[in-house]
Regions:
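Helix-to-loop junctions at the C-terminal end of transmembrane segments
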Residues: 48-60, 148
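A membrane-interface helix-boundary motif in multi-pass transporters
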Residues: 62, 146-171
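Hydrophobic core of transmembrane alpha-helices in multi-pass small-molecule transporters
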Residues: 89-106
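Cytoplasmic membrane-interface "Motif A"-like loop-to-helix N-cap segments
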Residues: 57-70
Length: 190
C-alpha cells in the first residue's frame, strides 16, 4: 500500500497537478514552473544515492529511511496547503527539491521487500511492488482530479480544490506511513 500511495502522490503531483498549481494558483510563469518541476527531479536523482548510503552504511535500516522519507513527503504536502500565493520562488524551490529527495526513499522499498522474501520468491515480490507502483498513478491521477471536480465544480483548478487534493494526499500518506511501521525488516549486517 505504501508504494501505491508514495508513487501515486509523486506521479499525480509531478506529471499533472504541479504545473496548474504553480501557474494558476501560485501565479508563476511557465519557465519558473518548469524549473521547479526540474528541481523536483534533481532532488530524486540526488536523493537516491544519498538515502541508499544512509540505509546501507549509516543507519543500517531500510524501513527507518523509508518512514523518514514518507514523513518528509507528508510535511512538504502539508506546507503546500499553508503557503500563500506569491511566496518567494526560493521557498518553493527548496520544497520541490526536498519533495523529490524524500520521494527517493521509495526506491528502498524494493530491497526492503526483496530481503524479507525467500530467494525463490524475489521475482514475485518485485512484481508485486511494480504492480502497486503502477496502480498508484492511475488511482491518484484520476482520483484527485475527480475529487477536485466533485468538490469544486466551478473552480476545480482553484486554490481550494488544490488544498482539498493536498489534504487527501496527506491523509493517504499518514495511513501509508503508519502501516509501514508494521512491516518487518531483516537486519542489515554489512
Amino acid at each position: 500500500f505504501s508504494t501505491l500511495v508514495r508513487y501515486g502522490v509523486l506521479a499525480a503531483f509531478q506529471a499533472l497537478w504541479a504545473g496548474p498549481y504553480l501557474m494558476e494558483v501560485m501565479g508563476y510563469s511557465t519557465l519558473a514552473t518548469g524549473n521547479l518541476i526540474l528541481l523536483l527531479n534533481f532532488g530524486m536523482i540526488l536523493g537516491a544515492p544519498c538515502l541508499g548510503t544512509l540505509s546501507d552504511r549509516l543507519f543500517r535500516t531500510r524501513k527507518g529511511v523509508v518512514i523518514a522519507g514518507l514523513t518528509g513527503i507528508l510535511l512538504i504536502i502539508i506546507i503546500l496547503t499553508l503557503i500563500p500565493p506569491g511566496i518567494h520562488l526560493a521557498v518553493l524551490a527548496l520544497l520541490f527539491f526536498c519533495f523529490g529527495f524524500f520521494n527517493a526513499a521509495g526506491l528502498l522499498m524494493y530491497p526492503h521487500i526483496k530481503e524479507m522474501m525467500p530467494l525463490e520468491m524475489a521475482g514475485v515480490a518485485m512484481t508485486g511492488i511494480n504492480f502497486f507502483n503502477m496502480i498508484g498513478p492511475a488511482v491518484f491521477l484520476q482520483g484527485l482530479g475527480s475529487l477536485m471536480q466533485a468538490l469544486y465544480p466551478d473552480a476545480s483548478r482553484g486554490p481550494e480544490a488544490f488544498n482539498a487534493a493536498f489534504k487527501m494526499c496527506s491523509v493517504c500518506l499518514v495511513t501509508a506511513t503508519t502501516l509501514y511501521f508494521f512491516t518487518r525488516e531483516k537486519r542489515l549486517d554489512r
